[in-house]
């Protein structure tokens, strides 16, 4: 899987990433979207809350149910899709960089084809590049070119906190995808849990890209395998006869990563080069948020 403009354009996928799941509502046809407000397209009904103007009451629904309901609308501009793209050295291992690039281009293509804005932030130990969210084909090509030209950079430790600060500072609201292997300490201080009042303006999803060998080794493996740490520059020997212990440890690492993401209000999915990433991401996005 190559990371060239030609290959990325030929294999870009349209992803169904903009409707998450049905709302538990007494009215048929309601869908849960990332953001709601007083725009122009009718979205859903909800019970009257403190501070809601009486002019927004839907009297037909109120008469039908005996409860006061107000109409909500999709914002005039739906929302921005942001891609936080890890370019730390560990992403250069195996085919991870190419897989991550294909996923990023597909997300950008899907966002812009759906008339949403899309932006891109590269990060490693710090923010390495920023393309503000905009719409249009020329903007998609700008994102594509940036991804093609991006190369893993050496750093002692990947830091995600700085890129999250950049996101929140620069973008008022977004549906954000973090593309990374997450093989580093997750120094989150932000929480993206959706509040009952809908005050959170960023819905964040994590797409963990790993090589198969970072998940498990084949049973009954034998021999010694030199492993090079792309970030520290150190090499260690792995005794393949300890495959069962290795598999157990790697599962513990992934479970810890998922737990920390969950605590920050970020749902996650793991993708390898062997996966159909479009199918897996579409399925992932149709799940109700489990960590909120």
Per-region residue spans from a language model:
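Von Willebrand factor type A / integrin I
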Residues: 1-33, 168-174, 193-292
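An amphipathic, basic-hydrophobic helix/alpha-beta surface used to engage anionic
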Residues: 1-134, 175-180, 185
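Short secondary-structure boundary/capping elements
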Residues: 65, 155-159, 249
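Von Willebrand factor
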Residues: 139-174, 214
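Short, catalytically relevant binding-site loops at active-site mouths
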Residues: 182-186, 211-214
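Short, well-ordered alpha-helical microsegments
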Residues: 185-188, 278
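Short, well-ordered secondary-structure micro-motifs
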Residues: 131-132, 188-190, 216-219
